[in-house]
């Protein structure tokens, strides 16, 4: 059981039992069992787990863990239609390895160990999402086992089809009927969600259930970021793309975040595949351990690296590289064509991984990864974080994607120390407050899980909170689907399960 008690978060929860199904029938059996005993007033919490890559404790639970590790088959590849059908436990690495034979790929830049079901359930925003779209834009259809064991396939219904679906005398029919009434009654709330600050807290994808033309209704979007609280994804039909061309890179350095922000704002208009910024203190720490950036190393004394990647056709790339160099005329800019090995650019991300696993640090836990911050807010935030650094007496270099506005900071805490665990929780609360004060969202980059669920409530209005609670009840009337995640997260629960030893080999 210990192998299923941790993920990449700061908590550790030992389950009562672990089930490892091989197919959808197995999951239906397990869900019927859990639902039957829940109706007899014995709730066995059910948590689905892919490869255990969650950073927020979403795949941990005290009840039954359903691991999809054996549901890892690629069922069908339609090269002509560019569609692929996979089981939810297929990893991104395996999928793209198979698709490469067809010169296709799923252009989502995430941890290769992530499962497709996990990517949908946690709904991360990757650095390429601005150009290609997040995982949401590549999912055509889902097969889901509901809380009572019923199996459904998501369908985009017309109004006539929706009326027929509502008449079904089973949980699926009650879901469509209840959700349609809920969406209609909360139209103004949903409109505010769609136009509000970018947040993954709750079930914000409810804003995509009823299309703007009011002619179609589809529950598929609700499972993005739901973290197994509404049902268990078993199969996915994905839309895939041709493998993109190898990118060309431009590196610029700046002494301040303000200067870097001015540059990135202009470069973003050229629609790069990726546009990332790194505090160079990250690379100075890596350099102490013999990890270097090759010919990029002399630039390390500047405050911030900005790395831009273009992967359009050759002529468009050449033009955009020239334009980017012109924008950065007052900065130090280097391209992969300028006697710099392409591997040196790839090494930037490798060195970030070295920083995250610094052997001289007790641990840099993923407490505040993937928060959302606008460009203008980023400058204000970089100033405010200096006071946090002073209070903690440690550096907090920022890194992330300007293109998607998703950033990460990794504090250094010794979770084996009681006082340090207390400081970590205080830091979590204060940091989330600073993010909101600067116009950002603490849960902008992925769903909140258990850990971020503690501090995501201020991002929701009372009506939004009530709406999300009602959605949960419609799908999970007996309340046993990952109940301590998202809206069910409590401070007492997280503190009780805080790890007392570090995670080895975790980024």
Show which residues each predicted segment covers.
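N-terminal glycine-rich flavin-associated loop
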Residues: 9-46, 64, 68-110, 122-174, ...
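Helix N-cap motif at beta-to-alpha junctions
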Residues: 24, 255-259, 310-317, 375-377, ...
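A short linear hydrophobic-aromatic micro-motif
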Residues: 45, 107, 272-275, 393-399, ...
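C-terminal substrate-binding/cap subdomain adjacent to the FAD-binding core in PCMH-type
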Residues: 121, 129, 139-347, 458, ...
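Helical (often loop-to-helix) elements that flank the catalytic cores of nucleotide-handling enzymes
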Residues: 416-436, 460-471
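Intrinsic disorder at enzyme termini
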Residues: 462-507
């Amino acid at each position: 059981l210990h192998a299923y008690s941790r993920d990449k978060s700061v908590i550790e929860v030992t389950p009562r039992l672990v089930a490892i199904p091989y197919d959808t029938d197995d999951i239906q059996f397990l869900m019927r069992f859990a639902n039957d005993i829940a109706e007899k007033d014995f709730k066995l919490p059910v948590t689905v787990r892919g490869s255990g890559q969650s950073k927020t404790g979403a795949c941990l639970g005290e009840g039954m863990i359903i691991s999809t590790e054996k549901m890892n088959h690629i069922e069908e590849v339609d090269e002509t239609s560019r569609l692929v059908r996979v089981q939810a436990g297929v990893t991104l690495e395996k999928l793209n390895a198979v698709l490469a034979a067809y010169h296709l790929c799923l252009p989502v830049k995430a941890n290769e160990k992530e499962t497709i079901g996990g990517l949908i359930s946690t709904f991360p925003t990757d650095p390429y999402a601005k150009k290609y779209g997040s995982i949401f834009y590549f999912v055509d259809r889902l097969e889901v086992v509901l809380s009572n064991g019923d199996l459904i396939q998501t369908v985009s219904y017309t109004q006539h089809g929706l009326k027929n679906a509502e008449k079904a005398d089973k949980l699926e029919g009650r879901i469509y009927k209840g959700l349609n009434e809920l969406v209609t009654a909360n139209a103004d709330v949903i409109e505010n969600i769609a136009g509000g600050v970018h947040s993954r807290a709750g079930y914000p994808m409810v804003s995509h259930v009823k299309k703007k033309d009011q002619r179609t209704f589809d529950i598929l979007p609700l499972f993005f970021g739901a973290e197994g609280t509404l049902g268990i994804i078993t199969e996915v039909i994905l839309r895939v793309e041709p493998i993109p061309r190898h990118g060309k890179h431009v590196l610029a350095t700046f002494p301040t975040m303000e200067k870097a922000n001015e540059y990135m704002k202009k470069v973003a208009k050229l629609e790069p595949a990726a546009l990332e910024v790194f505090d160079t203190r990250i690379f100075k720490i890596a350099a102490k351990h013999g990890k270097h950036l090759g010919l990029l190393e002399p630039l390390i004394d500047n405050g911030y690296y900005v790395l831009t990647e273009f992967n359009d056709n050759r002529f468009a790339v050449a033009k955009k590289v020239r334009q980017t160099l012109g924008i950065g005329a007052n900065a130090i800019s280097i391209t992969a064509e300028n006697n710099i090995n392409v591997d040196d650019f790839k090494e930037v991300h490798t060195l970030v991984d070295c920083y995250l696993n610094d052997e001289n640090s007790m641990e840099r836990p993923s407490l505040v990864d993937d928060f959302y911050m606008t460009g203008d807010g980023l400058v204000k935030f970089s100033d405010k974080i200096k006071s946090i650094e002073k209070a903690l007496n440690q550096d907090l270099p920022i890194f992330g994607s300007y293109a998607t506005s998703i950033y990460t900071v990794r504090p250094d805490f010794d979770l084996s120390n009681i006082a340090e665990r207390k400081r970590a929780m205080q830091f979590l609360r204060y940091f989330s407050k600073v993010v909101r004060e600067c116009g950002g969202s603490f849960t902008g980059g992925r769903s909140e899980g258990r850990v971020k669920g503690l501090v995501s409530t201020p991002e929701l209005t009372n009506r939004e909170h009530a709406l999300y609670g009602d959605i949960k009840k419609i799908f999970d009337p007996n309340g046993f689907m990952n109940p301590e995640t998202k809206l069910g997260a409590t401070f007492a629960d997280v503190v009780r399960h805080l790890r007392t030893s570090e995670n080895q080999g975790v980024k």
